[in-house]
Amino acid sequence: MLNTRRAMAVGVSLAASVLLLQGSVVGAATGNGRGGTMTFHVVFEPFNYTDLGAPGPSAADVIVFHDQLDQNGKAVGDEIGSCVLVDATGLSNCTGVMQLEDRGTITFSFVNSPPPHKVLAVTGGSGQFRTARGDGTLDENGDGTATLVLRLN
């Protein structure tokens, strides 16, 4: 049960935090509609798990996370979010917000499940990212980090 909870939580955290590998900003969606690809290294922080349903992973349980986002070995922001479990396998609905220094925010959502590869939708943003739309992937590295790639329109 603990291993299932840990794998599920790491998956959620990695997915949400699902979001990033060391790399560079090739481009970023800005208010003028330009798009591009952003790559981050995500450093997962301990998450909080609230067991609201049946004991152990079950529908209605909640995971909240707050993770660090790095590029080229430098912290460039963080992400916060939550996931609501829909069943005992760890399948969950997740939403989050990335804060990128003084540039603005990017919002995202994804379906979390145990596999280490997650696909997410970029649903909006603020500041330089106020017209952000697109998608991305989060790939868990198995060491408390992940690679996040966002493709913004």
Question: Model-found features: residue ranges?
Answer:
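Secretory targeting and sorting signals
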Residues: 1-28
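Beta-strand-enriched cores of mature, soluble protein domains
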Residues: 27-153
